[in-house]
Amino acid sequence: MAKDKDQNSIFAITKNLTITCFISGIIIAAVYYITSPVAAQKQVQIQNDTMRVLVNDADKFNKVNGKKDWYAAQKGNKTIAYVVPAESKGYGGAIELLVAVTPDGKVIDFSIVSHNETPGLGANASKDSFRGQFKDKKADALTVVKDKSNTKNIQAMTGATITSKAVTKGVKEAVEQVTTFTGGK
């Protein structure tokens, strides 16, 4: 008799656990279904805001046909920049960027979309003091150096050389892609 009671309690526990998991799964799926459109809309809003900050002269941003996640920044009917995604491997993993580049291949600015770099070191790559070095530079000048007297290239951040090189590599690749796409004009 004790054996039957133990088996019944095991089945009862299993049944209750299965029902609980099933109900939890339904609740999670319902919350995801309700919130995913809002999250997607918020992501688009963040990207649009970032593009406006990168190219504040633009009237509108149009998707570039044949290029995934590329946008042409338009002022009037003229393309004044391209906003291009880039990714590079930093000290803490992937660094995702949005890079604004002129049609003739000069960096306007960039924004770090996501990273896992060390706070206080690699995370400083998003600060104006580092980002400002990239302004108006073409691909050939996008090399990291540790010589403070060299203003032609990108000065590495102290304690974050790997991050400096990763961000510079990502920006350089974006510039090269735009230059290839436009023919440098």
UniProtKB/Swiss-Prot annotation:
Quaternary organization: The complex is composed of six subunits: RnfA, RnfB, RnfC, RnfD, RnfE and RnfG.
Principal EC category: translocase
PANTHER family: ION-TRANSLOCATING OXIDOREDUCTASE COMPLEX SUBUNIT G
MF terms (GO), sorted A to Z: electron transfer activity; FMN binding
UniProt EC number: 7.1.1.-
Role: Part of a membrane-bound complex that couples electron transfer with translocation of ions across the membrane. Couples electron transfer from reduced ferredoxin to NAD(+) with translocation of H(+) out of the cell. Essential for energy conservation during autotrophic growth. Contributes to ATP synthesis during heterotrophic growth.
Alphabetized UniProt keyword annotations: Cell membrane, Electron transport, Flavoprotein, FMN, Membrane, NAD, Phosphoprotein, Translocase, Transmembrane, Transmembrane helix, Transport
Protein's recorded name: Proton-translocating ferredoxin:NAD(+) oxidoreductase complex subunit G
NCBIfam families named among the record's database cross-references: rnfG (TIGR01947)
Compartment(s) of residence: Cell membrane
Residues bearing PTM FMN phosphoryl threonine: 161
Source organism: Clostridium ljungdahlii (strain ATCC 55383 / DSM 13528 / PETC)
Cellular component per GO, a single term: plasma membrane
Gene name, Swiss-Prot/TrEMBL: rnfG
Domain of life of the organism encoding this protein: Bacteria
Entry similarity comment: Belongs to the RnfG family.
